[in-house]
Regions:
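Non-catalytic terminal extensions that flank enzyme cores
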Residues: 1-54, 77, 334, 347, ...
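Residue patterns forming the tRNA-binding/recognition surfaces of aminoacyl-tRNA synthetases
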Residues: 3, 8, 17, 21-25, ...
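N-terminal catalytic cores of NTP/NDP-binding nucleotidyl/phosphoryl-transfer enzymes
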Residues: 31-94, 147, 156, 216-219, ...
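Short, solvent-exposed turn/loop segments enriched in Gly/Ser/Thr/Pro and often Arg
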Residues: 34-36, 44-45, 78-91, 144-152, ...
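Alpha-helical support elements that line or immediately flank enzyme active sites
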Residues: 56-58, 281-286, 495-503, 637
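Extended active-site and interfacial segments that coordinate phosphate-rich ligands
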Residues: 57-65, 215-250, 273-280, 290-297, ...
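Secondary-structure transition/capping motifs at alpha-helix termini
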Residues: 68-76, 97-110, 130, 134-139, ...
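Feature 926 captures the class I aminoacyl-tRNA synthetase adenylation module centered on the KMSKS loop
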Residues: 202, 394-454, 458, 502-545, ...
Length: 881
């Protein structure tokens, strides 16, 4: 017995109630079960800085597809959700919120600010959770984590102290990204690079003791105050005689050396560059190689400091104008050339970032990177698709020490304590009782917090209880797959891998599935500035979560960007309606019937064909899923349901359903096949469209608990019917051929015809003959005659050639001869006029020589087309006699 479905599919009536039921029944929850193989993944934790965007929707849809698939395959599937504290991003948001209330962050103080930020976290983490639930994701909400919860904080502290004690963490001076507005260091991920209109200022640097000078081009003339050398390429013949000599720094009149370094591109500009080690990362490295002094000429707010002489106190851009004016006045400015160049800005406040030399906490990366490199080379870790191997290796093989300290309040505070007496620091889990250097008992904790990526790098194992040796960690770790975007391979993926090896001795996952960005219909990245962002919740509200999910996965290929627009969502909704309507038809005809498995002998070729087709589909989709070809997998399911099942088998089934009173056994047989195949198709579709499939499945098989807890379809040898697949492929070809002929001849649907099928293959003939009653409606036939020869077929019958057979349609069944001859005569007259006109145009020498070539060619093409059409019309007229 089955239940009926509502007349139309309304996601709003289903999705929320369905999700509540799943949660109440703990279907998403996983506990250690040694009798099952685990499958684990961790959610890339979204930032608590606002609403989710379409990229989050894609990322979590992909993960949910995998976790639902593995759960149905029988794995003990665990998906750990959570959110990221997002350090500076959140701090900026809360600071702005306070500003709107007229509250100054500094006046509020650290503790007061943190209290407000925790309030923000509670509000937005809950919002994000609700948004994810609307998408239908099946993560274990009982295990939801936060990168600053007690367990994660314990892991962060343990890692910092462990790395410090092993000599990997140190405090030192290096070039970092500095935001003058937020007054903190930034990670590369927090710096957006955008092309801006700027200039190259060409400046003369006199060579000491000569009347020569070097011409240097710079986009930041204000940093001239901190220059400590000029560099040229060692192989540049133009400058070999002056390497080792001194140049005079304009305006400052300080002597600086001319050094040779392979960093210089001798083909770019003049082949000579100014070196400012305290204000450029590349110059910093050159400075280290040549033992150059580092002169920082900027304050934290990007004003010039006391080392800037008369420019001290000026804003960097004010100083730039003043310095350029002075260079021009004193004859050092050669020229100013407009130049478009990339400028780094803080992604949260939009301020132009300054590369500054600062004392910060760093992680030494050379040794930590080695196991992460080896993991890829030995196959312990793989990327899907493989092309991202190169990006991963490039970053690791060129890795620099990681700046982990931030001058903000929101985040994990660095566990370093400074002696109030001697200033030395101690790294410890708790504030020390006594200074090991001077014996003082008073300490102050480091004000800085850790880079947000420091805690998220531990996510795969901190969420399972590390550093404690928990049963969860032993059973569920390492995780199986990480799903993430290609834009954070360096910032997050690499750091998780080396952290996994450093602290657990294992890779945190064995596969990284990379997806691309979601772009708009024009291929542009979605952004606030373009105003082209699409809110996934609005799409869900209008079309339902399943339609959004199907849109995001259809055509999706690992690593590739995708375009998103409403027409695609409408197509997905139409598919949902197609599935619903076909299912409703089946359920209505099952009614109160107990559909039993029929004897094999009762199965028609069409029954065996559709069973064989869904069987092959299960095998193919499983292979695609295991290769992470989720877009290909869902396309196969889509095509099967829409084409083979709905458009062919359901239509073929109608004859036996509607003649149930005449043959109850045949009706039971076809209903069993419909129920069985629909059930299999719903299972294969479920990971992609969980709500609609669950609703239909529970109506189809009400005795079962849940579709998501049912078994994934597996290939059955007893459902392999190649001969019947062959028969159905021929029937489909015959039907399509007949439909094409009828369309070409404008035969109305109400007009039925005889159909002669001539074939020599006895098995094929028998197969088709056994289905003639079912296929008559599809072919608009009133009679189907199977013959091995053409005898009895009228000479003027229209023929359709298909593999292994020829189909004939008596012409008198298709058209009224007199009406058709009259129509063809009119068409002949029209075509003759068009041919005459085109020939006249092409015979006109003036037209041929003066008109644009494309217009002349267009007339030639028309003449050729009309001539072909006229020949076809005449042939049809001759056929009609």
């Amino acid at each position: 017995m089955s239940k009926e479905l509502a007349k139309t599919y309304d996601p709003k009536q289903i999705e929320e109630k369905m999700y509540e039921k799943w949660c109440e029944n703990k279907y998403f929850h996983a506990e250690v079960d040694r009798s099952k193989k685990p499958f684990t993944t961790v959610m890339p934790p979204p930032n608590i800085t606002g609403k989710l965007h379409m990229g989050h929707a894609l990322d979590n849809t992909l993960q949910d597809i995998l976790i639902r698939y593995k759960r149905m395959e029988g794995y003990n599937a665990l998906w750990i959700p959570g959110t990221d504290h997002a350090a500076i991003s959140t701090e900026v948001k809360v600071t702005n919120q306070l500003k709107e209330e007229g509250i100054d962050k500094k006046e509020l103080g650290r503790e007061g600010f943190l209290e407000r930020t925790w309030q923000w976290k509670e509000e937005y983490a809950g919002t994000i959770e609700n948004q994810l639930k609307k998408l239908g994701i099946s993560c274990d909400w009982d295990r939801e984590r936060f990168t600053m919860d007690e367990g994660c904080s314990k892991a962060v502290e343990e890692v910092f102290i462990s790395l410090y004690e092993k000599g990997y963490i140190y405090k030192g001076s290096r070039i970092i990204n500095w935001c003058p507005k937020c007054k903190t260091s930034l990670s590369d991920a927090e710096v957006e690079h955008e092309d801006q209109d700027g200039h190259f200022w060409h400046i003369k640097y006199p060579i000491a003791g000569t009347d020569r000078f070097l011409e240097i081009a710079t986009t930041r003339p204000e940093t001239l105050l901190g220059d400590t050398a000029i560099a040229v390429h060692p192989d540049d013949e133009r400058y070999k005689d002056i390497v080792g000599k001194m140049a005079i720094l304009p305006l400052v009149n300080r002597e600086i050396p001319i050094v040779a370094d392979y960093y210089v591109d001798k083909e770019f500009g003049t082949g000579a560059v100014k070196i400012t080690p305290a204000h450029d990362p590349n110059d910093f490295e050159v400075g280290k190689r040549h033992n150059l002094p580092e002169i920082n000429i900027m304050n934290d707010d990007a004003t010039i400091n006391e080392k800037g002489g008369k420019y001290a106190g000026m804003d960097r851009y004010e100083a730039r104008k003043a310095i350029v004016a002075d260079l021009d006045e004193q004859g050092y400015l050669v020229k100013v050339v407009p130049h478009m160049h990339a400028v780094g800005t803080h992604d949260r406040c939009g301020t132009t970032v300054e590369p500054l030399i600062k004392q910060q906490w760093f992680v030494k990366m050379d040794e930590l990177a080695k196991p992460a490199i080896n993991a890829l080379k030995t196959g312990e870790l793989r990327f899907v698709p493989e092309r991202f191997d190169k990006i991963y290796l490039h970053w690791l093989e060129n890795i620099k020490d990681w700046c982990i300290s931030r001058q903000i309040w929101w985040g994990h505070r660095i566990p370093a304590y400074y002696c109030d007496e001697c200033g030395e620091f101690v790294v410890a889990r708790e504030m020390p009782e006594k200074c090991p250097h001077c014996g003082c008992t008073h300490f102050t904790q480091d004000e800085d917090t850790l880079d947000t990526w420091f805690s998220s790098a531990l996510w795969p194992f901190s969420t399972l209880g590390w550093p404690d040796k928990t049963e969860d960690l032993d059973y569920f770790y390492p995780t199986d797959v990480l799903v993430t975007g290609y834009d954070i391979i360096f910032f997050w993926v690499i750091r998780m891998v080396f952290s996994g090896y450093a602290h657990t001795g294992k890779a945190p996952f064995n596969t990284v599935l990379i997806h691309g960005l979601v772009r708009d219909s024009q291929g542009r990245k979605m952004s606030k500035s373009l105003g082209n962002g699409i809110d996934p919740l609005e799409i869900i509200d209008q079309y339902g979560a399943d339609a959004l999910r199907l849109t995001l996965i259809t055509g999706n290929a690992p690593g590739n960007d995708m375009r998103f627009y409403n027409e695609r969502v409408e197509a997905s909704r139409n598919f949902a309606n197609k599935v619903w309507n076909a299912s409703r038809f089946i359920l209505m005809n099952m009614k109160e019937n107990v559909v039993e498995k029929p004897e094999d002998a009762l199965l028609t070729p069409a029954d065996r064909w559709i069973l064989s087709a869904v069987n092959t589909l299960a095998k193919d989709v499983t292979e695609n899923m295991d290769k992470f070809e989720l877009g290909i997998a869902v396309q196969k399911v889509y095509d099967f349901i829409w084409d083979e099942f709905c458009d062919w088998y359901v239509e073929l089934a109608k004859y036996r359903i509607w003649h149930a009173e005449e043959d109850q056994a045949a009706a039971n047989c076809v209903l069993w096949v419909l129920k069985t195949v629909l059930g299999q198709a719903l299972k294969l579709l479920h990971p992609f469209m969980p709500f609609i499939t669950e609703e239909i499945y529970l109506a189809l098989v009400p005795e079962e608990e849940s579709l998501m807890m049912s078994s994934w379809p597996v290939y059955k040898e007893e459902w392999n019917f190649p001969a019947d697949e062959n028969v159905m492929e021929h029937i489909k070809a015959i039907t399509k051929g007949i439909r094409n002929v009828r369309a070409e001849m404008d035969v109305p649907n109400s007009r039925k015809t005889k159909v002669y099928v001539v074939c020599q293959d006895e098995a094929l003939c028998n197969g088709i003959e056994g289905m003639t009653e079912s296929v008559k409606p599809l072919m608009n036939a009133n009679e189907i005659i199977i013959e091995q020869t053409k005898e009895g077929v009228a000479d003027n019958a229209v023929s359709v050639v298909v593999p292994d057979a020829v189909v004939y349609l008596p012409l008198e069944d298709l058209v009224d001869f007199e009406q058709e001859l009259e129509r063809l005569k009119k068409e002949e007259d029209r075509l003759n006029k068009e041919i005459k006109r085109a020939e006249g145009m092409l015979a006109n020498e003036r037209f041929v020589s003066k008109a644009p070539a494309d217009k002349v060619q267009a007339e030639r093409d028309k003449l050729e087309k009309y001539t072909e059409m006229l020949a076809q019309v005449k042939e049809r007229m001759e056929g009609l006699g």
